[in-house]
Structure formats: structure tokens, C-alpha cells
Amino acid sequence: MVHVYGSAYGEGMEPVNRREMSTSFGRAAASYEAGRPGYPAAAVEWMLQPVAASAARVRVADVGSGTGKLTRVLVDAGAEGVAGDPDPLMLAALAEAVPGVPTLVGSAEQLPLPDASVDAVVLGQAWHWVDPELGSREAGRVLSAGGVLGLVWNIRDGKTPWVARMTEIMHRSNAEEMMAEGGPDVLAPFGKVETQTFTWSRSMTAAALLEMARSRSFLITAADADRARIEGELSELFATLPELQDGGAIDLPYVTRAFRAVRP
């Protein structure tokens, strides 16, 4: 079971709706793969830094792996990875995108891994769906002593007016709400949480931006009429941007926020 709680995760939302939203992504796996960005290699390198020097090849569990956006960066970095997600449809997409990486169905609160079996547990765009007490405890169980918990999110930079308007239309995500309230909670057995920020941009067409919107839990679980209205408003916004006309592309600015905490 995936748990979400607290005002940062949608005050007033019933628990069953939270669970539905957190496990809804498999229905839009193709949109997720097409529309969601990867992660900066520098952010992944920073998260793994505490264990990189002491391990010949870092053993990493990518939890809430989705279609493998973070998994492929870990593989490129030379890590020995296993990917876990509560949704088999997302893992099927991951197996196509990142062949050869073992996959496991499971959640951050109940990892199907032995005690002290990995050097790092990482979650990309996922910890906001996790009960931080249970997730921290379970990450601590599967990590070896001195192992690291790494959390990372790609957040669109709302200082750009058209990006702010796009977010307003799509509705701010649970992750964005959490960041606005100070960031993720990481509890025992972990100590101090360090953080680092990385800024970058991704060139996207109007079609790719729509796929990104369709990959968000709010749209996936919305009623058909609401989904059509949101997509219509997004198309109207994109029609006002000269860069997106005639199949053109625009730079979507991102702020990637990475966090890490070491298990004693």
C-alpha cells in the first residue's frame, strides 16, 4: 500500500483517492515516457557521492522507478541497479526502455529486498507518495551501513510566466506542494538531510508538453470533461507562444532538487 498524508499532499483528499492517484501512472505509461524528463547526471552523481568512493560498483535500488527515467541515468553512471514500482504496467515500460535491469513489484514501505543488500536507495519523483516514517525505516533496513537514501525531483521553474500559467492550468502537483512547504521528511534511522539544486532546461514541442501534462496523476484520474477542458486550455496557451508554432520547440526550464541522507 502506498501512503500519502498531511497537508502537503492534498488537504481534504480522501486516502483512497490518494492511493488511486499514486498508482494511476501505469494507465499513462506511454505519455509518462514521452513527456517526462530524465534527471541531470550531476544530480545523480551527487546523491551517490557518499558511497561511490567505497564501492567498486554501487548497488542501487531505484524505488518508484516508473518507466526508468532515473534508472537509465544510474545505469549510465555504472551502478548495479534493481528497479521497483507498485505498478506492473510501469515496470513493463521500463523493461523496454532499460533492458537488462531486474524489476520487482513493490512499494517504498515494503521493499522485496533482503536486509543490508544495497548501497543506495533512490527515488525519483516518488517520495511525496510515501509514508516518510515507514519509507525511512524500510530504506534503512535494506541499506548497508553507511548507505545513502537519495531523493530527487524535477520541478518546472515557475519564474517564467508561461510556465507558471501552464502549472496553474494543470494544477500544482503533490511534489510541488511538498517543496513549497519545505521539502521531504526523512526520519530514523537517517540523520541530517543534505540538499543540492541543479538548474537546466529541456527543449519541448507543444505535443511533448501535452504528453507531459497527460502523465500527471491529476489529469489521469480526472473526469473526461475536466481532462478535455484542461487540455484545451493548455492548447490555447501553447498557441500564444511563437516558439511552438509550426512544430517548433521551446525551452522548458527545470529546477532539480536532490536530497541525500546517510544511514549510520
Regions found by a protein language model. Name each.
Residues 2-55:
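Conserved class I S-adenosyl-L-methionine
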Residues 3, 187-264:
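Conserved Class I S-adenosyl-L-methionine
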Residues 59-63, 67-110:
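Class I SAM-dependent methyltransferase SAM/SAH-binding core
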Residues 109-120:
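A short acidic, Gly/Pro-enriched loop at the edge of an enzyme's catalytic core
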Residues 125:
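Short catalytic micro-motifs in class I SAM-dependent methyltransferases
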Residues 130-138:
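A short, conserved alpha-helix within the catalytic core of class I
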Residues 137-204:
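Conserved catalytic/acceptor-binding region of the Class I
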